[in-house]
């Protein structure tokens, strides 16, 4: 309950500050957020033969080599072919080719407070998102 109150208070404060600064609050001006991942966050039965991780955002993104797939820990990072990361034609979905191991937990930051290269066309950085999943044995 305390966390929900803090979050609501922070949102109200942010909205008040934005309104005071004359910033229009709209889909265009607010940051993009993750709306879907493949595999889904929290999935504990991901096939180790999965060849790519996909993250879909709420808005069209800058797509020219613009992303921040970030390390949570060395133990939870998948083998990723960074030279082949790309966006789909929808300009919202970024695809990272990976090699996964069976029976392993993976955790990957999609943007962080420091690394913010996932950005929309208005240059707003995406809200950081932690993708965690586990492959089956």
Language-model features: locations:
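Positively charged n-region of N-terminal signal peptides that target proteins for export
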Residues: 1-5
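Bacterial N-terminal signal peptides
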Residues: 6-14
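Sec/Tat signal peptide C-region and signal peptidase I cleavage site
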Residues: 16-19
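Acidic, low-complexity Ser/Thr/Gly/Pro-rich repeat segments typical of extracellular/periplasmic
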Residues: 21-137
